[in-house]
Amino acid sequence: MIKLIATDIDGTLVADGTLDLNPEYYDVIKELKRRGTIVLAASGRQRASIEKVFTPVLDDISFISENGTCIHSKDYQYVDVIDPEIVRTYIEEARQFPGCEIAINKDNMTYMAVSYTHLTLPTN
């Protein structure tokens, strides 16, 4: 019996950066769960983006998001948190490089310096 099937999302199940999953996969995921097989989708994406891809089967699938730092399923969530002092050190070091842009991801959120207005979406 197959106990676990793990797959990448971007470039494997969907075209890079899209939400276009073949609807037939939803039935496959449900059938695998019925048979007792865990389906695990992994991505560097944030959780909200992955949830949009798998909305019809969120109760039937587990996923790894944020480049491996978060694991989610219907009944479980694990988030690996980096010590804030280490983050501060990395930010200070990165600021030494001209043109280096810093984005810090937290489960379902990205923090960017206010000076990076060229990277933000318009508000109107």
Residue ranges with predicted function:
Residues 117-123:
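Conserved small/polar residues in nucleotide/adenosyl-binding loops
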Residues 17, 123-124:
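A very general structural signal that marks isolated residues within well-ordered alpha-helical segments
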Residues 1-3, 59:
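Short loop/turn microsegments at loop-to-beta-strand junctions
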Residues 20, 24-116:
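Active-site phosphate-binding/coordination module
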Residues 10-12, 68, 122:
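Anionic group-transfer/hydrolysis microenvironments
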Residues 3-16:
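Asp-based phosphoryl-transfer active-site loop
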